[in-house]
Amino acid sequence: MCPPQAQAEVGSAMTEKTEMVCTSSPAPAPPSKPASPGPLPAEEVDHRNTCNPWLPPGVPVINLGHTRPTGAAMPTTELSAFRPSLLQLAALGTAPPTLALHYHPHPFLNSVYIGPAGPFSIFPNSRLKRRPSHGELDLVDGHQPQKVARRVFTNSRERWRQQHVNGAFAELRKLLPTHPPDRKLSKNEVLRLAMKYIGFLVRLLRDQAAVLASGPSAPGSRKPPAHRGVEGNARCGAGHRVEAARSQPVLPGDCDGDPNGSVRPIKMEQTALSPEVR
C-alpha cells in the first residue's frame, strides 16, 4: 500500500488536471507518445513496486507526482493562440454577405447606367450617359408607335434630300471643262472649279463688251432707215432726178453765150430740191 502522503499528491494532481481539461477549449490535445518498451529507471520501478503491487511485472507506469511539480499551473498561451484565428475566420465568414448586397445578378435591370451607383463604381452617374440596350429599344418602340413613324419619316426625307444633292452635283460636273474629261472630282473640287469657271466667263463677256464699245465706226457707213409713205417716195424721186442730171454729158458748144465754152453749173439741183425735201 502507498503511504497517505503519496496518495494525497496523486489525488491533487488528478484534480488539477481534470479542472484544466474542463476549462480548456474543445481543441484536440496532441496525442501522447507511447512509452518505449525499454527498461524503466530504477526509481520508477521501485515506486511502482511499492505503490501498485497488484500490477503484473513489465507494465510501464508513469508517476505523475514526480513528472510535474505540484504547484505548477498549465500555461494557457497555447489555447489563447487559437482564439485570434477563430475570430479571423468568423470575420471572413461574415464578409461575403456585405459584398453580396452590392452584387447585381441581372445587368439589364440593375446596371451602372440605370440603377444607383454603388461604392465600387469608378465614375459617378452625372458623367455617364444612358445608352439603352437593344431589348429596351424594342420595348420602348413597341409602346410608342408615333416615335417609330416619325423616325421612319425623318430617315426617308434625309435620304431623299441626299439623293437630290448628289444629282445636282452630277449635273454641275457635266458643265465643267476638265483636262481629262473623265476625271473624278469630289464635291469640294466641283464647287471650286464652278466658281473659277463662272468668274472666267464673266471676265470674257466684259472684255467683249469693252471691245465693241471702243471700236472705230465711219459716220457715213450706216444707211438711214427707209421710211415708207408719200414723203419717202418724194425723197426717192428727187434723188433719182438729181442723179440723172449729174449723169448727163455737157457739150462744149452748148453754153449760153459763153464763147470760151466753159462749163456752167447746172441749177437743176436747187430747183429739184423742194422745200418738202429740205
Swiss-Prot record:
Any GO molecular function: RNA polymerase II cis-regulatory region sequence-specific DNA binding
Residue ranges constituting the bHLH domain according to the UniProt record: 149-201
Segments of this protein annotated with the region Disordered: 1-52, 213-278
InterPro entries, per database record: bHLH_dom (IPR011598), HLH_DNA-bd_sf (IPR036638), TAL-like (IPR040238)
Record SUPFAM superfamilies: HLH, helix-loop-helix DNA-binding domain (SSF47459)
Cell compartment(s), UniProt: Nucleus
Major subcellular location class: nucleus
Residues modified as Phosphoserine: 274
Pfam name, any one: HLH
Keyword flag Ribonucleoprotein: no
Biological process according to GO: B cell differentiation; blood vessel maturation; definitive hemopoiesis; positive regulation of DNA-templated transcription; regulation of DNA-templated transcription; regulation of transcription by RNA polymerase II
GO (cellular component) term, any one: nucleus
Record's protein name: Protein lyl-1
UniProt lineage: Eukaryota, Metazoa, Chordata, Craniata, Vertebrata
